[in-house]
Amino acid sequence: MDYKETLILPDTSFPMRGNLPANEPHTYAKWRDEKLYSKLKNAHSGAKNFCLHDGPPYANGHLHIGHALNKILKDIIVKYHYFKGENIRYTPGWDCHGLPIEQQVEQKIGKAKKDNLNKTKLRELCRNHAQKFIQIQSDEFQALGVLGDFENPYKTMDFAFEAQIYRSLIELVKEGLLAERSKPIYWSWACETALADAEVEYQDKQSDSIFVAFTLSDSALQSLGISQGKVIIWTTTPWTLPANVGIALNPSESYVLTDKGYIVAKALLEKVCENIDIGISKREFKAQEFERLEAINPLNGRTSLIVLGEHVSINDGTGAVHTAPGHGEDDYYIGLKYGLEVIMPVDDRGNFSPLIESMGLVPKEFANEFVGKNIFDTHESIFKILGKALLKQDVITHSYPHCWRSHKPVIYRATAQWFILLDKPFYQGKTLKELALEELDKVRFYPQNGKNRIYSMIENRPDWCISRQRDWGVPIAFLIDKITNVALLDEAVLEHIACIFEKEGCDAWWSYEIKDLLPPSHKHLAENLTKSKHILDVWFDSGSTWSAVLENEYKGAGNNYDAGSHPADMYLEGSDQHRGWFQSSLLLSCAIAKRAPYKQILTHGFTFDRNGEKMSKSKGNVISPSEIIKTQGSEILRLWVALSHYQSDQNISDEILKQVGEQYRKIRNTIRFLLANASQNSQDMVEKDELDVIDRWILSVCDRVFDEAYEYFDEYEFAKAFQVVMSFLINELSGIYLDLCKDILYCDDVSSLRRRAIQSALVMILRRVLHFIAPVLTYTADEAFRHSSAALKGEYESIFDLPKLSCAQGYNLEINEDFTRLLRVREKFTESLDNLKKQKIVKSSLEVLLQSPQEKEFALLDRWLIVSGVCGKECKDKEELARFMLEDKEEFVIYRAQNGRCERCWQFIVEESEGKLCKRCTSVIAQTKK
């Protein structure tokens, strides 16, 4: 007889292979058809809310692996809160304005055609480009298994959204937090236009390199207690010296006065002496001793304030940087800190204006050598005026920014820009900066050091320049008085314009006549007004998303999103957003709503190849999410995210994904075994107190492990959660429990109590496993649930209905036995058995008996160690194979089993009189025949 046919072997329709690339799209289509996200939104109404507000990706290009990491993390967290029983909201969004889209349009139609287009047509082309990639990216995000309100996403270019961005600007006007002032930007004097960073390319350029001595003022000499002192500066832009108002020193450095009266950074003294003989060190000072003292500009005799700046390099130069806030970004920001004057004597064409004469920026007798002359053509005149203060002049070749259109060198030039004031008291005597820092103290950060990053950035940041000189964006729609050049900030006018934007979008700013932008009460002013040419910084757009998307008192009509309330429970982005979206959102929310827009901030690192290098097409090391999905399935990518310590930078490669695939197969195979052996119907489940002690042990371990894992989930430490769960699945569950249950599952009668007890335990474990993996391996959990028995499903229709159930809720898990000791017994026994196998003395644990000193655990050890029997002293006449001892000196002896092997269960327990089968197997077969 073939006894194999009498065994109850595992049986499940759940396939061993997931065939994920083929099956995932069908499952997602089913979810979409069922309007699953809408169901999830409504499933826990009335419960605790959890709203993750989506940081909008840019609507340009396909997704890269960083996008995948970000969106999968968000999806895991939203789903985790859903499976916790919370009322979740997640509305995806897109950032639609900005220079990259303008560039793409120009590349497509050509610069000449773009320059001849009217603004409305150009913006239409930009809008179409953005919409195209929103659809592409939406499909790609959903292919990652991400659930959200993709039917009603937010787009910053929607008319109502543009109106809301503009209304945020109006709120700042009301708070008195806007100011117009000059700020240096890249300027192409050859094209007479401002340039964005992306429009600047670096080329080698020959420049004059000069060392100039600024004599300290009498009061400065007195303060320092010295009789003479000249601070040496080094610059490669001599034409900026007329606009000098300061000298910046590095606050972390020491400075020396030489015996010849010159002052340079101590660290650079030797290097400077290679160029100029300035003598040897005579006295040393801390940089702070010079702060706010004055020196004299030798070009024009004007005072130059000594300031401290972290930007001052100690790698080259003198450690003292000539500072002209109108001609440099670092100079400008340090100027804001110290209140330095912004002087701009250069016109649109790169020529010195009459201002250079009227302000006395050069000696009057030399003015005609400057006014109307190109700045680069005035160096010889500058050298002549400097005289002996010019310590050395040379020519160097260095990398210098050039205009991408004219290929001429660009300059930094201060122009009128709009700013949000951070240091002006506006609310309960607090400045915006103070309020923002105060609100940050209420925010929970993951990781915690993220708080220090954004805190120090805001603490040290200057006022926020929100104006840009581009076409594709939300206009700073202010009407300017032609005579006074002052903006008309009347609330009725601003609100009237906002209403127009709400209906027709902000393209109306360019297409409408000024009179049509004014309310009836102000139309008489039209002839005296002109339109501002600025648009808003795109960070203002994304920083306003909370006001347009989340429920709040400032939300305008037309922004109909069911996305949760302000403040959001979480913002989650890459660590670079401490400088970006987290900061812009915080500042605008504090300015308008007087509170932070988020309760928690979670950040992740960046993704690199296996060698830690940045991915690029030229290196051939790009790993595309779409390729992974096509070849391996998004589940592998999702598990990679969950297993990664994502708060740091992450590496990804085919080899790493292969390792992740192996982890996935372990999880899938465990689920498959559980499905194949668990109870089929609820009536097969045993009663609360009918579990065997080993079943109670595994369920108590299961509860402990998953409770610990959920604690890690609560802190968003998914890798640690999976580590403890994987250890349980591999060691306690598969390595011990499932192994020792196989005999009962396969060989006992189908209705035996102990078999049904194991099957009941497997149902409880499977529920916990599926509930745990569902936020991460949603496709797999969904598939497994569909292949589950009625016993597991119970009253639930889908995996998304499955609640978090502990094993202790279903069964009495009280244990009196010492399983810590039993695990040590098993460990020692396994070591001895492995040695016996290596020596080819036995092939299986079923070939041995064990002598135990404690009679009460004979029956337990029999099953626990998968041996053919446990005995006391009566075993001594058997063939001894090995012995082992516990730490407490308890000794166990391993003997060879003497009885015959049962041909059905393979245990060596058949007496000579019993034939080929043991008593249990004989009884089961007899029952089967009935």
UniProtKB/Swiss-Prot annotation:
InterPro entries: aa-tRNA-synth_I_CS, aa-tRNA-synth_Ia, Anticodon_Ile_BEm, Ile-tRNA-ligase, Ile-tRNA-ligase_type1, Ile-tRNA_ligase, M/V/L/I-tRNA-synth_anticd-bd, Rossmann-like_a/b/a_fold. CDD domains: Anticodon_Ia_Ile_BEm, IleRS_core. A motif ('HIGH' region) lies at residues 57-67. It is an enzyme of class 6 (ligase). Its cofactor is Zn(2+). Keywords: Aminoacyl-tRNA synthetase, ATP-binding, Cytoplasm, Ligase, Metal-binding, Nucleotide-binding, Protein biosynthesis, Zinc. ATP binds at K617. It catalyses: tRNA(Ile) + L-isoleucine + ATP = L-isoleucyl-tRNA(Ile) + AMP + diphosphate. GO terms for cellular component: cytosol. It comes from the Bacteria. L-isoleucyl-5'-AMP binds at E573. Zn(2+) binds at C902, C905, C918, C921. Coiled coil: none annotated. GO terms for molecular function: aminoacyl-tRNA deacylase activity; ATP binding; isoleucine-tRNA ligase activity; tRNA binding; zinc ion binding. A motif ('KMSKS' region) lies at residues 614-618. Binds 1 zinc ion per subunit. Its EC number is 6.1.1.5. It is found in: Cytoplasm. Its main location: cytoplasm. GO terms for biological process: isoleucyl-tRNA aminoacylation. HAMAP family: Ile_tRNA_synth_type1. Belongs to the class-I aminoacyl-tRNA synthetase family. IleS type 1 subfamily. IleRS has two distinct active sites: one for aminoacylation and one for editing. The misactivated valine is translocated from the active site to the editing site, which sterically excludes the correctly activated isoleucine. The single editing site contains two valyl binding pockets, one specific for each substrate (Val-AMP or Val-tRNA(Ile)). Catalyzes the attachment of isoleucine to tRNA(Ile). As IleRS can inadvertently accommodate and process structurally similar amino acids such as valine, to avoid such errors it has two additional distinct tRNA(Ile)-dependent editing activities. One activity is designated as 'pretransfer' editing and involves the hydrolysis of activated Val-AMP. The other activity is designated 'posttransfer' editing and involves deacylation of mischarged Val-tRNA(Ile). Monomer. This is Isoleucine--tRNA ligase.
